[in-house]
């Protein structure tokens, strides 16, 4: 293994929310921690990316055969247009990438990685803290109308995301490729809420440390 190619979103990029409520790339992000431990990762993850954007990035990236290709999406794909929700809470709003399309694009990503003789590894999206995330997306919007769309149940946001995590697991099984269930790793932590930023969705630096440690246990470095 000469290199590990990583395509993903803000979680893989190492984004955290600071005390001023600004997003920044942390020097203690999970990938940076792994690179410091000798993991040869080429990180193409970008804050806000969906699987279609990641696939386009992959198509424009030169890769060498025989290396792992880590694919980490779902958090942005499932996200809603919260402006539209707050303006029209009485009609259905789908995710940025509808679930069936998400599955198909994941399978396409896996196939194109294999066509380049890479070893695809799918990663589940992180769980979120529904209450925090509801408060976060309600800022500057009509919180009552958003809550009406959620049928007075902010926890439904987490269940909506879970559908995309299940799709990642099922796609890995159907395609016969490796699965890294980061979602399960985080939920195993009894103090999970303390590992998530105030926006309810991004891991903080303590969370990134957990992800890095478990990833290195899961994929011990060779050589």
Question: Which sequence ranges carry the predicted segments?
Answer:
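A short acidic, helix-capping loop that chelates divalent metal ions and anchors anionic groups
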Residues: 13-17, 52, 79-80, 131-132
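Alpha-helical cap/lid subdomain in secreted, periplasmic
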Residues: 36, 59-223
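A short local structural element in Rossmann-fold oxidoreductases
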Residues: 16, 55, 191
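Short, flexible loop segments at the rims of nucleotide/cofactor-binding pockets, characterized by
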Residues: 20-22, 45-49, 98-99, 156-157
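Cell-envelope and extracellular/periplasmic
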Residues: 11, 45-49, 73-74, 83
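Structural motif
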Residues: 48-58
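Serine-esterase "nucleophile elbow" of acetyl-processing enzymes
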Residues: 1-45, 59-65, 204
């Amino acid at each position: 293994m000469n290199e590990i190619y990583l395509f993903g979103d803000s979680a893989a990029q190492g984004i955290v929310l600071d005390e001023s409520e600004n997003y920044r790339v942390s020097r203690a992000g999970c990938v940076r921690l792994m690179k410091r431990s000798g993991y040869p990762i080429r990180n193409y993850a970008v804050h806000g990316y969906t699987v279609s954007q990641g696939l386009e990035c992959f198509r424009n990236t030169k890769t060498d055969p025989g290396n792992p290709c880590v694919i980490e999406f779902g958090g942005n794909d499932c996200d809603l247009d919260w402006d539209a929700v707050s303006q029209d809470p009485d009609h259905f709003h789908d995710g940025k990438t509808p679930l069936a399309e998400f599955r198909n694009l994941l399978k396409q990503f896996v196939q194109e990685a294999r066509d380049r003789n890479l070893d695809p590894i799918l990663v589940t999206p992180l769980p979120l803290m529904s209450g925090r995330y509801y408060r976060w997306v309600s800022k500057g919007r009509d919180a009552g109308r958003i809550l009406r769309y959620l049928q007075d149940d902010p926890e439904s946001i987490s269940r909506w995301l879970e559908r995309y995590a299940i799709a990642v697991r099922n796609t890995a099984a159907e395609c016969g490729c490796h699965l890294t269930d980061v979602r399960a790793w985080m939920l195993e932590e009894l103090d999970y809420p303390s590992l998530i930023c105030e926006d309810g969705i991004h891991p903080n630096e303590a969370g990134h440390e957990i992800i890095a440690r478990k990833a290195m246990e899961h994929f011990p470095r060779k050589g």
